[in-house]
Swiss-Prot record:
Name of this protein: Ferrochelatase
Annotated function: Catalyzes the ferrous insertion into protoporphyrin IX.
Family, per entry: Belongs to the ferrochelatase family.
Chief site of localization: cytoplasm
High-level lineage: Bacteria, Pseudomonadati, Pseudomonadota, Alphaproteobacteria, Rickettsiales
Gene: hemH
Keyword Membrane carried by entry: no
SUPFAM superfamilies hit by this protein: Chelatase
Keywords, comma-separated and alphabetical: Cytoplasm, Heme biosynthesis, Iron, Lyase, Metal-binding, Porphyrin biosynthesis
Subcellular location: Cytoplasm
Cellular component, GO annotation: cytoplasm
Length: 342
């Protein structure tokens, strides 16, 4: 019997206008994966943060048209992926988008999936490196809202996927023409306590960067992994991207910034990297080049397509695997979705 496949793309979401900034912030900070506290304390904290940060966040979003570009970017990725898959598979399929903290929410998407009436569902996060705060939260929320009994295949991560690495390399090589450049691979930060609790995010970031550096094959390449978007007084992953730009400026080192954990343009890249961090480089009069996110880059879309083809062809159902069909995280990372290796 011919398969009928529902493919769900996960991403963070974002406000569609300035009025929706506050509810977006509340949804974000009310997530137990972000603030792991019991209610009503978590609810109160999320309310306070969403109220106190609303004006500042509105000002930031006003710099990029008063809304997040993430949904539009994801729609474009969905279209590119649909066109590519149509060329390669005979099965019926439909691609759905599920945002975690803004519409389309899981409940709405599941309603659409039920009308489509698939024989199986494949979950594909647009987070290449796994974290319990991103993919983990999205998958958990989707499954909690799912009220039909259906085979599900979950792709937890793809930090070492061949064409994913090649896509990054191709974009970097377009700009890497001077030996004086220092490459900063900038990833979204996480509190240290989340990593210490067994989250494999920083491990997978390192794996991705090492694979890119190996593929670039440049002797004595000057590069660092850095983390951006810190919030609050707690300890976050280090080094901080801002601090490393300052350091490079003092050394008169020109910079190439690679947004290594983002596959779509949104506020962290368009404002934080393109405006705020560039001002630091301008202060020191060093060259500052920002590599674009992968978006609808053909090599990246090929990467996602190849991952989906692998999972479509798997006979096993109710799978949770990395794109390589194995657990890539050492067993110490207990938050990894994949089964522990023996």
């Amino acid at each position: 019997m011919k398969k009928r496949i529902a493919i769900v793309l996960f991403n963070l979401g974002g406000p569609k206008n300035l009025k929706s900034v506050k509810p977006f912030l509340f949804n974000l900070f009310y997530d137990k994966a972000i603030i792991n506290l019991p209610n009503p304390l978590r609810y109160i904290i999320a309310k306070i943060i969403s109220i106190t940060r609303e004006k500042k966040s509105q000002k930031i979003y006003s710099l990029i048209g008063g809304k997040s570009s993430l949904l539009q970017e994801t729609e474009e990725q969905k279209l590119a992926l649909t066109e590519k898959l149509k060329q390669l598979i005979k099965e019926d399929f439909a691609i759905f988008i599920n945002m975690r903290y803004s519409a389309p929410f899981a409940k709405e998407v599941i309603g659409q999936i039920k009308k489509y009436n698939p024989s199986e569902i494949i979950l594909l996060p647009l987070y290449s490196q796994f974290s319990s705060t991103t993919t983990g939260s999205s998958v958990k929320n989707f499954l909690q809202n799912l009220d039909i009994d259906i085979p599900i295949k979950t792709i937890c991560c793809y930090p070492l996927e061949k064409d994913f690495i090649k896509a990054h390399v191709s974009l970097i090589k377009e700009k890497l023409y001077d030996k004086n450049f220092r490459i900063l691979f900038s990833a979204h930060g996480l509190p240290e306590k989340i990593i210490k609790a067994g989250d494999p995010y920083s491990f997978q970031i390192k794996e991705t960067v090492q694979a890119i550096v190996k593929e670039l094959n440049i002797k004595d390449l000057d590069y660092k992994i850095t983390y951006q978007s810190r919030v609050g007084p707690i300890e976050w992953l280090k080094p901080n991207t801002e601090d490393e730009i300052e350091l490079a400026g003092k050394l008169k080192k020109d910079i190439i910034i690679v947004p290594i954990s983002f596959v779509s343009e949104h506020v962290e890249t368009l404002v934080e990297l393109d405006i705020e961090y560039k001002l630091i480089a301008d202060k020191y009069e060093i060259q500052y080049i920002r590599i674009p996110t992968l978006g609808t880059n053909k090599i990246f879309i090929n990467s996602l397509t190849n991952i989906l083809l692998r999972f479509i062809n798997k006979v096993d159902t109710n799978l949770v695997m990395s794109s390589s069909s194995t657990r890539i995280c050492p067993n110490e990372f207990t938050k990894c979705l994949c089964k522990l290796t023996s």
